[in-house]
């Protein structure tokens, strides 16, 4: 059966002034999918260290199915500090475990049983994980209803035009926020100032099944091929789903 839904990419700890909290969009995605009763997996890598063991423990406690390799790199962390005005500043550590997700025989078997996968741009900052993500996408069987969801997440300088273009071509669903859309439009030279026009350009250029534009408190928009109309979704807080948190 090809009905597994996968969240693939970074698994890490956000280290805040008040303590650490588990983070990573792929794990968040897989967790919330599982809460709807679907068969999900999180695919990532952690280190052979205490932080890595803690991530595995949290996922097990949450009954989140996973395919996580332990590798000879430290478990990923994001250092969160506050400036003098209380604005958070983020430092995403480099050379960590989720930068080095290996493509194993077990991962190949998972890809062959996957109907939908969600991946981002951050986990592709390193060549090893980028190659693994692309091999996974290319290994997935070409079946009706298959979804390759690119949840773009532009962080610091951990993205490039080449990686983004390749991901646009490999995905069939794109999720992007309004700030990221402005950045992408500048990088690729998309004309006009209307955000919806830019979404239609992306939808057509990359033959997407769907494009989801999130605009924070201003709501979200869903674009699909066909007549130019889009569905407006109500705003519920920020553009990100509630995060998976460590059990207290």
Walk through the language-model features, giving the residues of each:
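Conserved beta-alpha-beta core of the PfkB/ribokinase-like small-molecule kinase fold
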Residues: 116, 121-201, 218-220, 225-226
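Proline-centered loop/turn at the N-terminus of a beta-strand
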Residues: 4, 147, 173, 209-210
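Conserved phosphate-binding/catalytic region of the ribokinase-like
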Residues: 1-3, 192-248
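Active-site flanking residues adjacent to catalytic metal/cofactor-binding acidic residues
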Residues: 9-10, 44, 150-152, 176, ...
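Conserved strand-to-helix beginnings and helix N-cap segments that scaffold or border functional pockets
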Residues: 19, 52-53, 104, 129-131, ...
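Structural alpha-helical scaffold elements that stabilize or flank donor/cofactor-binding regions
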Residues: 109-110, 166-167, 204
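Conserved N-terminal subdomain of the carbohydrate kinase-like
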Residues: 39-121, 138-144
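Glycine-rich phosphate/adenosyl-contacting loop at the front of the ribokinase-like
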Residues: 1-64, 78, 238-241
């Amino acid at each position: 059966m090809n009905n597994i839904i996968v969240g693939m990419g970074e698994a890490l700890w956000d280290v805040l002034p008040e303590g650490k909290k588990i983070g990573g969009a792929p794990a968040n995605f897989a967790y919330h999918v599982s809460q709807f009763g679907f068969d999900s997996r999180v695919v990532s890598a952690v280190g052979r260290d205490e932080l890595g063991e803690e991530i595995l423990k949290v996922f097990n406690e949450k009954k989140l199915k996973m395919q996580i390799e332990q590798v000879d790199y430290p478990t990923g962390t994001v250092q969160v500090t506050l400036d003098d005005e209380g604005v958070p500043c983020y430092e995403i550590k480099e050379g960590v475990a989720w930068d080095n997700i290996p493509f194993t025989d077990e991962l190949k078997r998972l890809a062959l049983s996957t109907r939908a996968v969600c991946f981002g741009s951050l986990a592709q900052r390193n060549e090893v994980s980028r190659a693994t993500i692309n091999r996974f996408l290319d290994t997935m069987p070409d079946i009706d209803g298959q979804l390759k969801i690119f949840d773009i997440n532009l962080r610091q300088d951990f993205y490039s035009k080449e990686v983004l273009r390749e991901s646009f071509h490999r995905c069939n669903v794109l999720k992007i926020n309004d700030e990221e859309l402005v950045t992408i439009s500048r990088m690729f030279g998309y004309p006009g100032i209307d955000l919806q026009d830019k979404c239609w350009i992306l939808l057509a250029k990359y033959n997407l099944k769907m494009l989801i534009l999130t605009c924070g408190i201003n709501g979200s928009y869903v674009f699909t091929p066909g007549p130019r109309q889009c569905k407006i979704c109500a705003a519920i807080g920020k553009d990100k789903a509630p995060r998976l948190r460590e059990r207290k």
